[in-house]
């Protein structure tokens, strides 16, 4: 796996995965960003939730469950600096 992160403007970045998918990242306006993309820490939560959802779905399907809906909620709290 690999990923490439390229500065666009200000605090915005384009992130591109090894499979060619892209996402725009930015920091919050109160941290100097312009709210042009998802926050990097939010990406961590999405990655965790996505991996969990895919693993659960594969296990359910392996057990021959007919899954028509699946939702994973992930909450995180950033440590105080």
Where are these regions (language model features)?
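Extended beta-strand/beta-hairpin segments
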Residues: 1-46, 57-81
């Amino acid at each position: 796996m690999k990923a490439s992160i390229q500065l666009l403007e200000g605090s915005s970045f384009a992130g591109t995965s090894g499979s060619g998918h892209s996402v725009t990242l930015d920091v919050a306006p109160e941290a100097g960003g312009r709210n042009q993309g998802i926050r990097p820490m939010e990406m961590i939560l999405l990655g965790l939730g996505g991996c969990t959802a895919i693993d659960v779905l594969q296990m359910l399907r392996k057990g021959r469950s007919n899954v028509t809906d699946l939702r994973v909620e992930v909450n995180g709290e950033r440590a105080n600096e």
